[in-house]
Swiss-Prot record:
Organism encoding this protein: Adiantum capillus-veneris
Gene behind this protein: ndhB
Subcellular localization, as worded in the UniProt entry: Plastid, Chloroplast thylakoid membrane
GO CC annotations, alphabetized: chloroplast thylakoid membrane
Domain of life: Eukaryota
InterPro entries in the record: NADH-Q_OxRdtase_suN/2, ND/Mrp_TM, Ndh2_N
Described purpose of this protein according to its UniProt entry: NDH shuttles electrons from NAD(P)H:plastoquinone, via FMN and iron-sulfur (Fe-S) centers, to quinones in the photosynthetic chain and possibly in a chloroplast respiratory chain. The immediate electron acceptor for the enzyme in this species is believed to be plastoquinone. Couples the redox reaction to proton translocation, and thus conserves the redox energy in a proton gradient.
Stretches that traverse the bilayer: 18-38, 51-71, 87-107, 111-131, 134-154, 168-188, 211-231, 244-264, 278-298, 306-326, 337-357, 379-399, 411-431, 470-490
Name of this protein: NAD(P)H-quinone oxidoreductase subunit 2, chloroplastic
Length: 498
């Protein structure tokens, strides 16, 4: 009996120390999806969906257990930061898969391929969030980017989707090239080091200061592409509009969260002694992102293009949290608002996915009179849009309040003032949709777009009758309730300064 207890204790300790166990579980899930799809010849779709959800849940549970173990025995701020973003990526994958199944079945596409690429993208993002060397960072970033690119072109017969894929692939390749060149400069300046902490030691007393600035510039440009920061945002509206809506929902949060973790780790660990210089540069990018994103979003007629420009402005707000980090609060304001943004954005995209399945359109004018047809969808979309706009008492308001207050304390007065003004502008185009849903007259019937979708409704019901509605309601409620429980969230995210 004592031997069994000793064995179990050793197994528990070994599992807790194996920090990549959540990623290993995801890899096993990937293999299981591929093997079962081959054996069943694509017929057992419910089992594939079930395996994906169980894999993500198991990975999240293991991650939380390991996090609690390390918190109790060996505290590490860098590990806390990585674990938070790994958990965020698992949440993104869970909610996006549950809100995508109906769409994929109605599109008559292979569910196995879709789940494979989503799990692969989540895996790449998780590895990227805690990577400590340049090689792992680059490989995991490309893994995430290629998986997202394949998802973007998932509907192969759609010309808009093919165009979006080509733009995404070209721009992603260009940004990766810039980032790789920045890494090569860091590698040379540090004397051939790959580990981030050793690179810092190698460049502190380096005499080639101008090359260090050049490396920081290329690194900023490469990560700004992934974040859709001005002026590296040009690909975002076209890719958002052309890609399938559930795919846009997925990489609008997944790629942003992973790239944000990368940006923060690189500049927080490698360039802390040049903070004045890169703070000015990133502050300018954030300012123009907030102004441009909100002003152009006002003029859009497509909901997906509007949300694309909205996401550009949102990442500008989040940059305030990155620039205002300190040893007392860490990156608490940035992480807190990122978590709230995930819920708001996924909830909004779940609503427009459901609307698109019924009408086949994403034109803002077609939302007229939606309240009379589907009150649940209408109120869910209202909650998510108002939260994105920062209206009280929703979570977006409390997230922005904490973010802007933290930025004001850090002396980022001009950035905070711009953020406040542009937040007011954003409320206008969100309220425009809300007003249309309640007061407009609809001329479009609330039925699926074509007979092919009609024939697949029964198949969709057998697999995931309410998965999209459930994901939509969960995100809508979370967009409200997470603001009420914001204090515990802030407390968890405080010890994250490198």
């Amino acid at each position: 009996m004592n031997d069994i207890n000793l064995f179990l204790a050793k197994l528990t300790y070994t599992s807790a120390k194996l920090t990549i166990l959540p990623e290993i579980i995801l890899i096993l899930g990937l293999v299981a999806v591929v093997v079962i799809d081959l054996l069943s010849k694509g017929k057992n779709t419910f089992l594939l969906y079930k395996i994906s959800m169980v894999t993500l849940l198991a990975s999240a549970v293991i991650l939380l257990w390991q996090w609690g173990f390390f918190t109790a025995y060996e505290r590490s701020h860098a590990r806390d930061f990585g674990n938070i973003f790994r958990f965020f990526l698992l949440i993104c994958s869970l909610l996006s898969i549950s809100s995508s199944v109906d769409y994929i079945l109605c599109s008559k596409m292979s569910l196995a391929e879709f789940l494979l690429f989503k799990l692969a993208a989540g895996l790449g993002g998780m590895v990227l969030s805690c990577a400590n060397d340049l090689v792992t960072i680059y490989v995991s970033l490309e893994f995430l980017a290629l998986s997202s690119c394949f998802l973007s072109g998932y509907t192969k017969r759609d010309m808009r989707s093919n165009e979006a894929t080509m733009k995404f692939l070209l721009m992603s390749g260009a940004s990766s090239s810039l980032l790789l060149y920045g890494f090569s400069l860091l590698y040379g300046l540090s004397g051939g080091q790959l580990q981030l902490d050793k690179i810092v030691d190698g460049i502190i007393f380096n005499r080639y200061g101008s090359i260090i600035y050049l490396s920081a510039a290329f690194t900023t440009a490469g990560t700004a592409f992934k974040l859709s920061l001005f002026p590296f945002h040009q690909w975002t509206p076209d890719v958002y509009e052309g890609s399938p809506t559930p795919v846009v929902a997925f990489f609008s949060v997944t790629s942003k969260v992973a790239a944000l973790a990368l940006f923060t780790r690189l500049f927080g660990l490698i360039f802390p002694y040049f903070s004045n210089e890169w703070h000015v540069a990133v502050g300018l990018l954030a300012t123009f992102s907030m102004i441009l994103g909100n002003l152009i979003a006002v003029t859009q007629r497509s909901v997906k293009r509007m949300l694309a420009f909205s996401s550009i402005s949102q990442i500008g707000y989040i940059m305030i949290g990155v620039l205002s980090a300190d040893s007392g609060n860490g990156y608490a304001s940035m992480i807190t608002y990122t978590f709230i943004y995930i819920l708001m954005n996924l909830g909004t995209f779940a609503c427009i996915t459901l609307f698109g399945l019924r009408t086949g359109t994403d034109n803002i004018r077609d939302y007229a009179g939606l309240y009379m047809k589907d009150p649940v969808l209408t109120f869910s979309l209202v909650l998510c849009l108002l939260s994105l706009g920062g209206m009280p008492p929703l979570s977006g308001f409390f997230g922005k309040l904490y973010l802007f207050w933290h930025g004001w304390k850090a002396g980022l007065y001009s950035l905070v003032l711009v953020a406040l003004v542009t937040s007011v502008i954003s409320i206008y185009y969100y309220l425009k949709i809300i007003k249309l849903m309640f007061t407009g007259k609809s001329g479009r019937s609330d039925t699926p777009l074509n007979s092919r979708q009609n024939s697949l409704v029964s198949l969709s019901i057998s697999i995931s009758k309410n998965s999209l509605e459930i994901a939509m309601i969960i995100c809508a409620l979370a967009s409200t309730l997470s603001g009420i429980f914001i204090d515990p969230i802030i407390e968890i995210t405080r010890n994250t300064f490198f």
